[in-house]
Amino acid sequence: MIGKEATIPDIVLELQQLVQPTDLHCYEELSEEETETEEEPRRIPYKIVAPCCFCGSKLRLIVLATHAGIRSQEELLLGEVQLVCPNCREKLRHD
């Protein structure tokens, strides 16, 4: 810069000296241990006690389910799906 005031060419020259190209490619390699894998949801054992839809006897089921899975099962058993005990199943088979 020559003189007391900066001129446009002086400013542009200074900016070009500050700007440096940046390599945006990442050449880092991850080991197999570091690669992210989706963890399978944890399955927890649940005991379900529900009545037979015909005679009312208690039926016991043990299931392995995720939190979302057991909620879905609960909705089904309280709604559209009903359980039948072995004795009532035999009666249904013969009718």
From Swiss-Prot:
Tree of life domain: Viruses
Q: Where is this motif: LXCXE motif?
A: 24-28
The record's keywords, sorted A to Z, are: Activator, DNA-binding, Early protein, G1/S host cell cycle checkpoint dysregulation by virus, Host cytoplasm, Host nucleus, Host-virus interaction, Inhibition of host innate immune response by virus, Inhibition of host interferon signaling pathway by virus, Interferon antiviral system evasion, Metal-binding, Modulation of host cell cycle by virus, Oncogene, Transcription, Transcription regulation, Viral immunoevasion, Zinc, Zinc-finger
Region E7 terminal domain, as annotated, extends over 1-40
Tell whether Zinc-finger is among the UniProt keywords: yes
Give residue ranges of zinc fingers (unnamed).
52-88
Q: Which Gene3D superfamilies match?
A: 3.30.160.330
InterPro entries named among the record's database cross-references: Papilloma_E7 (IPR000148)
**Region forming the signal peptide:** none
- Carries keyword DNA-binding? yes
Cellular component GO terms, alphabetically?
host cell cytoplasm; host cell nucleus
For this protein, the record's Pfam families field holds: E7 (PF00527)
Its GO biological process annotations read:
DNA-templated transcription; symbiont-mediated perturbation of host cell cycle G1/S transition checkpoint; symbiont-mediated suppression of host innate immune response; symbiont-mediated suppression of host type I interferon-mediated signaling pathway
Protein role: Plays a role in viral genome replication by driving entry of quiescent cells into the cell cycle. Stimulation of progression from G1 to S phase allows the virus to efficiently use the cellular DNA replicating machinery to achieve viral genome replication. E7 protein has both transforming and trans-activating activities. Induces the disassembly of the E2F1 transcription factor from RB1, with subsequent transcriptional activation of E2F1-regulated S-phase genes. Interferes with host histone deacetylation mediated by HDAC1 and HDAC2, leading to transcription activation.
Comment text on domains = The E7 terminal domain is an intrinsically disordered domain, whose flexibility and conformational transitions confer target adaptability to the oncoprotein. It allows adaptation to a variety of protein targets and exposes the PEST degradation sequence that regulates its turnover in the cell.
Q: How does it assemble?
A: Homodimer. Homooligomer. Interacts with host RB1; this interaction induces dissociation of RB1-E2F1 complex thereby disrupting RB1 activity. Interacts with host EP300; this interaction represses EP300 transcriptional activity. Interacts with protein E2; this interaction inhibits E7 oncogenic activity. Interacts with host TMEM173/STING; this interaction impairs the ability of TMEM173/STING to sense cytosolic DNA and promote the production of type I interferon (IFN-alpha and IFN-beta).
Q: What family classification does the UniProt entry report for this protein?
A: Belongs to the papillomaviridae E7 protein family.
- Protein name, please? Protein E7
Tell me which species this is from.
Human papillomavirus 17
